[in-house]
A protein has these predicted regions:
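A solvent-exposed, acidic/Ser-Thr-rich amphipathic alpha-helical stretch
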Residues: 7, 27-80, 85
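Short beta-strand edge/turn micro-motifs at domain boundaries
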Residues: 106-125
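Short hydrophobic/aromatic-rich beta-strand segments that constitute the beta-sheet cores
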Residues: 40, 89-90, 120-121
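Short, low-complexity N-terminal intrinsically disordered segments enriched in polar/charged residues
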Residues: 1-28, 32-36
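Short, surface-exposed coil-to-beta transition loops
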Residues: 74-76, 103-109
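Short, cysteine-centered beta-strand-loop-beta hairpins and adjacent loop/turn segments enriched
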Residues: 68-71, 95-104
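A short hydrophobic beta-strand element
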Residues: 83-93
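Residue-level signal for well-ordered, solvent-exposed loop/turn and beta-edge residues enriched
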Residues: 39, 101, 117-119
């Protein structure tokens, strides 16, 4: 007998994302909600990052970012707005980053969901 796992709807994925983001549990979001073939897309010519593809490389990108944070001054994440197979949140951070100093960044984070998992994260800042 095979036990199949129920596929989450986009509303369920967005709600779980919101719950974890509100607790600043970004790696848990990746572990629980990201597909193995997830893509992470940064703005062209970003001074901070390059894109990554695959759950492992996307995780490594996040870990490298966290290592560079020298001081965390504050952050917020808005509630998700859902449209079709995508949801978006606003995210603001006030952080001191190695090599950049103190930065305040406001961005839109767009996520695409397929088969109950996040297959794309794209950042606009």
């Amino acid at each position: 007998m095979t036990i199949s796992k129920a596929v989450m709807t986009i509303r369920e994925v967005a709600a779980r994302f919101n719950e974890l983001a509100g607790q600043e549990k970004w790696f848990e979001i990746q572990d629980e909600l990201f597909a193995d073939n997830v893509r992470s897309v940064e703005p062209p010519n970003s001074p901070y990052f390059r894109g990554a593809e695959g759950k492992g490389p996307v995780r490594k990108k996040g870990e490298e970012f966290v290592k560079k944070i020298l001081e965390f001054h504050g952050a917020y994440t808005t509630h998700p707005v859902i449209g079709g197979s995508h949801f978006a949140v606003g995210r603001g951070m006030d952080i001191t980053v190695e090599g950049f100093g103190r930065i305040k960044i406001d961005q839109v984070m767009l996520y695409e969901v397929k088969d109950g998992q996040i297959v794309l994260e794209q950042f606009f800042y």
